């Protein structure tokens, strides 16, 4: 493997492992429905590891930057609002299997060039 760093400037934390995975996958530009371990964890009633059954069950809390000072202000939004301007490139074994739709690789309605997405 020859991974490339792609700094996003975020810290992820959750009490629910699937909620955390959904947020991370969304930030990476992948489609959680195409990743079996996430999809199956949300559907399992036999060994439930999560209360998350869909992306609608996840809320994102973002600490507001207060001019570089610690702030107690928090912004809440739905998982669907989360995204990244620079999607990750999956491992070759997953290439063309887990990426989000072409529409998800747009930022402000503008398609990202190939060199940015690699």
Language model features: what each stretch is:
Residues 1-118:
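Acidic/aromatic/glycine-rich contiguous surface patches that form carbohydrate-binding/processing clefts
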